[in-house]
Design a protein with these regions (language model features):
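Bacterial N-terminal signal peptides
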Residues: 26-36
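N-terminal active-site segment of His-dependent metallophosphoesterases
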Residues: 40-107
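Metal-dependent phosphoester/phosphodiester hydrolase catalytic core
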Residues: 44-50, 56-59, 86-89, 119-121, ...
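Acidic/histidine-rich helix-loop elements
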Residues: 50-74, 130-151, 176-185, 215-217, ...
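Active-site neighborhood of phospho(di)ester-bond hydrolases with catalytic His/Asp-centered motifs
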Residues: 50-52, 91-95, 120-126, 206-209, ...
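Active-site environment of divalent metal-dependent phosphoester hydrolases
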Residues: 57-60, 99-102, 126-133, 176-180, ...
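Extended active-site neighborhood of metal-dependent phosphoesterases/phosphodiesterases
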Residues: 107-192, 229, 255-263, 272-278, ...
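Conserved beta-sheet core of the metallophosphoesterase superfamily
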Residues: 219-288
Length: 329
């Protein structure tokens, strides 16, 4: 009888130890899983919208491939869609906010842009200023600062840090001393850019400009005159770099090793679209996720499509609209 009791207690004790061991293992696995999930959730992510070539005209007409008579409606719809998105860090307008470089047009468009729920910034386009006109760089910048408490810059090219691990660099590649649709980045700005890229060697650099370094399609009258020089400077750095451009009203994405070149189409002409970009910095890579938004003003979009030749040039390939691109570190 005593022997049977000893066996019973040994079995019970062994069973209890087994349960304790299983509980400890389960607890350890749970902690490890939670730590892993937390590590993933702590990835440094940045979300921003690129909105380009709005060509706002208060009383325009649709007599070109641009839907100038509809730009207020197109802009209001885009702003409404942007405001519906969550956790957007900023909105960047990459040039041609207005179609004609007049003060009254800038004053007319600013109340629309002020409806954005997120900080917004601006890069100059060739339609934003004119040679010898009243709407000079200084006047334009002062009007932007008056309308936008987040815009505190004195120069037409500038930089800021939106979040740890990222540096935003805005270039002004517009020629202001001659009437042209071409672009150029002068030596003074190139030296400044080098200093900014030096500061971002351990970060992800995000460069915004109007005239693209890589053309979505060939157009000698719209190209960046010193594109190869600018590309050489940017690609001499090995950290992840995204370059976001407009001007050609077309979608194009090209990756050169650690540099991703993204051209975004116009809001004012087909496909009447903009982008939401999410950038995530991991230890061994940086991931760019591009998401495409078209206008909900479908009647305007259909009309705009009829006004362009070879509409697929402007929409690009599917992965140039919605795509995920990785840059290894």
């Amino acid at each position: 009888m005593r022997h049977q009791k000893e066996q019973y207690y040994r079995k019970k004790s062994g069973s209890l130890l087994s349960k304790v061991a299983n509980t400890v293992v389960t607890l350890c696995m749970t902690v490890a899983l939670m730590w892993g999930l937390q590590a993933c959730s702590n990835v440094s992510a940045l979300r921003f919208v690129q909105l380009s070539d709005i060509h706002f005209l208060e009383n325009g007409s649709n007599n070109t491939f641009k839907m100038l008579g509809e730009t207020p409606r197109l802009l209001d719809d885009a702003i409404s869609q942007i405001n519906e998105q969550k956790d957007v860090d900023f909105v960047m307008i990459t040039g041609d906010l207005i179609d004609k470089p007049f003060e009254k047009e800038l004053r007319a468009v600013l109340p629309h842009v002020q409806k954005l729920n997120y900080p917004w910034y601006f890069a100059f386009g060739n339609h934003d200023r004119c040679v010898g006109g009243y709407l000079t760089t200084n006047v334009y910048m002062e009007m932007l600062k008056e309308a936008n408490s987040d815009f505190k810059f004195d120069n037409s090219y500038y930089s800021f840090v939106p979040k740890k691990g990222y540096r935003v660099i805005v270039l002004d590649d517009i020629i202001t001393n001659e009437v042209t649709s071409q672009g150029y980045v002068d030596e003074k700005q190139l030296k400044w850019l080098k200093k900014e890229l030096d500061k971002a060697k351990n970060d992800t650099a995000l460069i915004f400009m109007h005239v693209p370094i890589i053309e979505p399609f060939a157009s000698p009258n719209h190209r960046l005159k010193n594109a190869s020089q600018l590309m050489g400077l940017i690609e001499s750095y090995k950290n992840p770099i995204g370059v976001f451009q407009g001007h050609y009203h077309a979608a194009r994405v090209v990756q050169h090793d650690n540099v991703l070149y993204v051209s975004t189409p116009a809001l004012a002409s087909y496909p009447d679209a903009f982008r939401l970009i999410t950038v995530q910095n991991y230890k061994d890579k940086t991931v760019f996720e591009l998401k495409w938004f078209e206008t909900r003003e479908k009647t305007i979009q259909k009309m705009a499509k009829l006004l362009v030749i070879a509409s697929s040039i402007y929409t690009g390939e599917e992965n140039e609209r919605d795509g995920i691109y990785e840059i290894k570190k």
